[in-house]
Amino acid sequence: MLKRLLIVLTSLALMTGGMDPAGSFRIEEIPDEIFESMQGRSFNEPAPVKREDLRLLTVLYTDFEGCTQKGQIICNKKIADDLIDIFRELYENAYPIESIRLIDEFDGDDKASMRADNTSCFNVRPKSSSRSGFSSHAYGMAIDINPLYNPYVRTRDGVTRIEPEEAAPYVDRQKDFPHKIDSQDLCCRLFRAHGFTWGGAWRSVKDYQHFEKSLN
């Protein structure tokens, strides 16, 4: 109830400041200054997508302190409407997200972004599970939510790899702790309802932060 009240009060403050909260959830083509900042960070050649395939989203979200924040996401235009709908509903339900910042603010460093528990989408990089091929993030078709509490986990030849490494306390999904995404979590249910696959349901690896949609 308190979080919902904070959202209402913040929305009123936005309106008195002359900005329509509904307009805070919007989709636009990638502005020149944003695309320039992506060079050598999230956008590296060869890239599997072009600038015109991408969209910049602006969303509101509730942070871990229960306060309203504004975030930005770059994604493939094919999932832009899905993400706007999902993040609007997450916000309306005061779903806590620690950070939503463009990964370019971390110089395109996925590990640094995850350590900061930053939610992000587009980033031209290889698959985590192999040295060849692009990650679905490179197409802007995947997003990671609260990654510090929902790590990538892979065990091979008796060796367990955790990303980010700082997420080791959250690998045991039988434990109860805040910000854990499971199959009954609102975030998971919303993404699945929009046709996304959840990495936490994979067999060979577990990627609890990860939601992706097929490009085709």
Indicate where each model-derived feature is located:
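Sec-dependent signal peptide recognition
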Residues: L2-V8
